[in-house]
Amino acid sequence: RKMDARVLDLCSGSGCIGCAIADALPQTRVVLSDVSPEAMDVSRHNVNRNGLEGRVSFMLADVTKAPPIMTGSFDLVVSNPPYIPTFDILTLDPSVRDYEPVWALDGGEDGLDFYRAILKNWKGVIRQGGMLMFEVGEDQAGDVKDLMRMAGLHDAQSIKDTRGVERVVTARA
């Protein structure tokens, strides 16, 4: 609820989540981060298109590696990482499978690789008492909450989408 919060959007892709946060909370500063230069270009376009320059910045970074930023820098970290299990990608609807690059979908054998990587490498960028929020795939909320608890985060909870599916998992540092 902190109005002047610093927010990090990991695996930001087009930047829609971070842009929505920046738009809804004008005092907030958002950093969009992705491993893909092409995704960062799309993010820049979306930031400019929505008049969010000056409040949203960009960081090219790989969540599977140590972060290039200081410990405790962010009040909120959000991420919609790749979460489709590798073997499920071929069964996706063509409108998804043929539109998105495979690396933007493939979450590893169980779909949880990026959650593990973010918790291992990036949880330290969240200030004490700050929050981590993940979008999760169907039937992944319980596993992701367990990973968060094992990583030392507290108050792991899930939020259901309009279909009643646990779609977002949150926890506090």
List each model region and its residues.
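Conserved SAM/SAH cofactor-binding pocket of Class I
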Residues: R1-T91
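Glycine-centered flexibility sites
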Residues: D9-G18, A61, P82, G107-G111, ...
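Alpha/beta-hydrolase-fold catalytic nucleophile elbow
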Residues: N80, Y99, E135
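Mobile active-site "lid"/loop adjacent to the S-adenosyl-L-methionine
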Residues: Y83-D113
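Conserved Class I SAM-dependent methyltransferase catalytic core
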Residues: E109-R172
